[in-house]
């Protein structure tokens, strides 16, 4: 996606702030359902980070797999939990929480001071040119799309129906 510089920066700041707010929601919200939906926001923001870098297939795969499947399973699992047994001995702040926050804060500040000083332009990511890699990725994505929509269409749809039936069966068994 060819965006002008300021719009690209604003988009990245918006996605980054959504990612940070969603991560804080996962950690700080006490209601498990709200925490699971915050995790969904985090996963959506992560998948949207791939769109400005022209990785549309990876963004769509992230949305389908993580948001569409994993997060839905987490929400179902949270809905079937008995919430009263988890809130009986709830302490607001423990020694382990303080130690963990100290370690995470020190790692955050070390990353904040290290990343701007690192010269990223001298790092050789690959030995091949970027054009060849982009052509390979484009052809691979096109090949995957062609095979999924022609050769493997019926098995792909059958597997999705089998997974849907298994999920509904698991929910029905958990209800009883």
UniProtKB/Swiss-Prot annotation:
It is an enzyme of class 7 (translocase). Pfam families: Oxidored_q3. GO terms for molecular function: NADH dehydrogenase (ubiquinone) activity; quinone binding. It is a multi-pass membrane protein. InterPro entries: NAD(P)H-Q_Oxidoreduct_6 (IPR050290), NADH_UbQ/plastoQ_OxRdtase_su6 (IPR001457), Nuo/plastoQ_OxRdtase_6_NuoJ (IPR042106). It is found in: Plastid, Chloroplast thylakoid membrane. The keyword Plastid applies. The chain crosses the membrane at residues 10-30, 32-52, 61-81, 92-112, 152-172. It catalyses: a plastoquinone + NADH + (n+1) H(+)(in) = a plastoquinol + NAD(+) + n H(+)(out); a plastoquinone + NADPH + (n+1) H(+)(in) = a plastoquinol + NADP(+) + n H(+)(out). Its EC number is 7.1.1.-. NDH is composed of at least 16 different subunits, 5 of which are encoded in the nucleus. NDH shuttles electrons from NAD(P)H:plastoquinone, via FMN and iron-sulfur (Fe-S) centers, to quinones in the photosynthetic chain and possibly in a chloroplast respiratory chain. The immediate electron acceptor for the enzyme in this species is believed to be plastoquinone. Couples the redox reaction to proton translocation, and thus conserves the redox energy in a proton gradient. This is NAD(P)H-quinone oxidoreductase subunit 6, chloroplastic. The gene is ndhG.
């Amino acid at each position: 996606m060819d965006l002008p510089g300021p719009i690209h920066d604003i988009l990245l700041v918006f996605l980054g702030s959504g990612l940070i707010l969603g991560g804080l929601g996962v950690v700080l919200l006490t209601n498990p359902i709200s925490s699971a939906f915050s995790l969904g926001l985090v996963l959506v923001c992560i998948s949207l980070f791939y769109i400005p870098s022209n990785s549309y297939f990876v963004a769509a795969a992230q949305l389908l797999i993580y948001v569409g499947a994993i997060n839905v399973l987490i929400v179902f699992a949270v809905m079937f939990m008995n919430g009263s047994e988890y809130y009986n001995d709830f302490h607001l702040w423990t020694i382990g929480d303080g130690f963990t926050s100290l370690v995470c804060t020190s790692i955050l500040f070390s990353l904040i001071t290290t990343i701007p000083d690192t010269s990223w332009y001298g790092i050789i990511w690959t030995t091949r040119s970027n054009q060849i890699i982009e052509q390979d990725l484009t052809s691979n994505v096109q090949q995957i799309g062609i095979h999924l929509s022609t050769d493997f269409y019926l098995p792909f749809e059958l597997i999705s129906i089998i997974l849907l039936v298994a999920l509904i069966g698991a929910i029905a068994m958990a209800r009883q």
